[in-house]
């Protein structure tokens, strides 16, 4: 079938290249709730979640917990221990997600965030505002940050945040 010894190698190389190109999703642009245009590859597979774990897990559905590589866990485990226990019982992998600290008590760590190598960071609007001085480090590392907002308590923000989570 292959008369020239390099023909087989060339065909194999082309197959690998085509396969790789099919898997590499081109970046898309999404608009977060602050009106910021954010470019990222979808679906994100290594997510850091700053807040709204119940909302994220409800929208992300099956497999959503496996995509989390870091969270602000301390406040959730302390303020809602019974709910946290139920989540861990149904999705045991959540117990292994690293705690990156809490923005409210200024323990959130950009270093820990960078160390888990996320391809997306999802923050609440208030977290984004509080971390404004530190976020350029994520941008310099090529890590997109998307802002959602359920604290506004408006239908518009809830819908925008939920639709955005569904895209990510």
PLM features: what roles do these ranges have?
Residues 1-5:
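N-terminal secretory signal peptides that target proteins for export/translocation
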Residues 9-19:
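Bacterial N-terminal signal peptides
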Residues 11, 22-59:
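Bacterial Sec-exported substrate-binding components of ABC uptake systems
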Residues 25, 33-35, 42-45, 63, ...:
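Extracytoplasmic
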Residues 27-30, 120, 130-168:
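Extracytoplasmic substrate-binding proteins
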Residues 38, 44, 56, 99-103, ...:
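Second-shell loop/turn segments in exported
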Residues 45, 56, 66, 111-115, ...:
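Solvent-exposed, polar/charged alpha-helical surfaces in well-ordered, non-transmembrane soluble domains
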Residues 49-50, 55-115, 120-126:
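A short, structured surface patch at a secondary-structure boundary
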